A protein has these predicted regions:
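N-terminal catalytic or cofactor-binding beta/alpha core of small enzyme domains
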Residues: 1-124, 129-217
């Protein structure tokens, strides 16, 4: 249903970075819903059950996300079941890769290289939204910073962001439950002075009570 698909959207997340864009920061905004193709998954994170007939020479990654139904093309959602009535054709998959997935990552690569070459270092901030989390013993984080446990960026970046969130009385966490995925793995390159971090923002911080439209936050 449309309500279920909303859970797969980083709804209005581009508005979170509008001030940075206005200040001159380079930004690349995805305009395809995650249900269509997940840009935060590798090409081999494709569930073989999603394609008919099978793609020649294709070997799936067997990643945990893919096996859980949230691969390159999400197949199912918890409490919602299957998202597609039938498997997709191999031509459809290739079209989505060639027209959306590959150009998106190529644009990121080019932008990071240009910035690194100009300033000596570059930082990718990968902005997403998340559903409100639940917690028991302590307040649930409303912002989660991911650096793949220090693999995609020096810890200084994450520490600065968490400190900033807490200074605004917003509960923040590091790498739990979202450490970052393919975008950070692909584009973070510490040896090349290109660093990458992920920011997950609780949708209730900036959307209305129905989590559909921009709110007062």
């Amino acid at each position: 249903s449309p309500e279920d698909l909303l859970r797969l959207e980083d709804r209005y997340a581009d508005r979170l970075v509008a001030p940075a864009i206005a200040a001159g920061t380079a930004a690349i905004v995805a305009h395809r819903a995650r249900a269509w193709i997940d840009l935060n998954r590798a090409e081999d994170d494709l569930d073989p059950e999603m394609v008919s007939p099978r793609m020649d020479g294709f070997k799936a990654s067997n990643s945990l996300k893919m096996r859980g139904g949230l691969g390159l093309i999400p197949r199912r959602l918890l409490h919602a079941g299957d998202l597609w009535k039938r498997p997709l054709s191999s031509e459809d998959i290739k079209h989505r890769l060639e027209q959306f997935h590959r150009p998106y990552h190529l644009a990121i690569e080019r932008s990071l290289l240009n910035i690194r070459n100009r300033f000596g270092t570059a930082l990718l901030v990968d902005v997403h939204s998340m559903p409100p989390l639940t917690a028991t013993a302590m307040p649930a984080p409303r912002i989660v910073i991911g650096d793949r446990f220090g693999q995609s960026a020096p810890s200084l970046y994450a520490e600065m962001l968490i400190e900033r969130a807490r200074s605004l009385n917003v509960a923040a966490a590091l790498n739990h439950p979202y450490p970052g995925d393919y975008i950070l793995r692909r584009h973070g390159n510490a040896q090349g002075n290109i660093h990458a971090i992920q920011i997950e923002v609780d949708r209730s911080l900036y959307l209305d009570s129905m989590l559909r439209e921009p709110g007062p936050g």
